[in-house]
C-alpha cells in the first residue's frame, strides 16, 4: 500500500514541500522536522504583535505577512507560521511547528511537533501532536490527535494487512487533504486517514481510513419514552 506523502497531500503550493523529499512514508517528515527547522532562517516576524502575545525563543519564530495573532496567544520557537494564518487568543504553539498559508490555530488549541499544510484549521479546543494535517483539513471542536501509546511501545501503523512498526514513540495522525473530522473525535496514535474523508462526531478513529470514505458510528442513539 502506498503511504507516501503524495498519496495524502497535494504539495505543489506548500512552501515547505522539501521536508517530504526522500521519505517513503508520509509520517517520516516528522522525523526530519526539527532538523529542517534548524536549517531555516528563522526570526523574521512580518507583522505587528500585541504586547500580550507571549513569545518564547523569539529568535527562532518566523511569522509571515498578513498573519493575525490575537492577544493572549503563546508561540514557542522553533516554528514557522505561514502567510495569512490566524492564531487566536489562548492558542498554544509548543514548538517544532510549521503551518502553511491561511491556517487557523484557535482558542484553547494546542499544537506541537506537527505540520499543517495550507488552509488547515484546528479552531476550537483541539490537540494536535506529532501529526500532519493536509490542505483544507478541518478538525471540529474538541478533536484530539492522541500521539502516545499507553504501554509506551513504538507506534505501529495498521493499513490493510500491513503492520508497520515506526521508529517513533510519539506519532499522532496523518490526515489527507480535504478531510473533515467531526466534533469530539479522538484519533488513536498512528491513525492514517486519506483524502476527503468525512468522520462523524464523537468517534474513536484508528488504523487506516481510505480516501473518500466515511466513518460513522456502528449504532445509533435510541429515544424512548420515560
Where are these regions (language model features)?
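Glycine-rich beta-solenoid repeat tracts in large extracellular/virion proteins
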Residues: 53-56, 74-75, 92-93, 110-112, ...
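Terminal amphipathic alpha-helical/low-complexity segments used for targeting or macromolecular assembly
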Residues: 1-52, 196, 202, 211-213, ...
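Glycine- and small hydrophobic-enriched segments that form the cores of compact globular domains
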Residues: 61, 67-99, 103-118
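Long amphipathic N-terminal alpha/beta scaffold segment
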Residues: 32-83
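Glycine-rich hexapeptide-repeat left-handed beta-helix
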Residues: 16-19, 107, 113-119, 123-226
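Residue-level "contact hotspot" at macromolecular interaction interfaces
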Residues: 60-62, 80, 98, 132, ...
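Fold-independent oxyanion-binding glycine-rich loops
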Residues: 52, 65, 72, 89-90, ...
Amino acid at each position: 500500500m502506498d503511504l507516501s506523502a503524495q498519496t495524502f497531500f497535494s504539495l505543489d503550493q506548500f512552501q515547505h514541500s522539501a521536508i517530504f523529499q526522500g521519505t517513503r512514508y508520509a509520517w517520516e517528515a516528522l522525523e526530519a522536522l526539527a532538523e529542517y527547522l534548524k536549517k531555516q532562517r528563522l526570526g523574521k516576524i512580518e507583522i505587528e504583535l500585541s504586547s500580550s502575545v507571549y513569545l518564547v525563543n523569539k529568535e527562532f519564530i518566523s511569522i509571515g505577512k498578513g498573519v493575525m495573532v490575537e492577544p493572549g496567544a503563546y508561540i514557542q520557537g522553533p516554528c514557522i507560521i505561514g502567510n495569512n494564518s490566524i492564531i487566536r487568543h489562548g492558542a498554544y504553539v509548543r514548538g517544532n511547528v510549521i503551518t502553511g498559508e491561511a491556517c487557523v490555530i484557535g482558542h484553547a488549541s494546542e499544537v506541537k511537533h506537527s505540520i499543517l499544510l495550507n488552509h488547515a484549521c484546528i479552531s476550537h479546543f483541539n490537540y494536535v501532536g506529532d501529526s500532519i494535517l493536509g490542505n483544507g483539513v478541518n478538525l471540529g471542536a474538541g478533536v484530539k490527535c492522541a500521539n502516545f501509546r499507553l504501554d509506551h511501545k513504538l507506534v505501529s501503523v495498521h493499513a490493510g494487512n500491513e503492520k508497520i512498526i515506526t521508529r517513533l514513540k510519539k506519532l499522532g495522525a496523518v490526515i489527507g487533504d480535504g478531510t473533515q473530522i467531526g466534533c469530539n473525535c479522538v484519533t488513536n496514535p498512528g491513525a492514517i486517514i486519506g483524502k476527503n474523508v468525512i468522520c462523524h462526531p464523537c468517534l474513536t478513529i484508528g488504523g487506516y481510513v481510505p480516501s473518500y470514505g466515511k466513518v460513522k458510528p456502528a449504532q445509533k442513539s435510541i429515544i424512548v419514552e420515560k
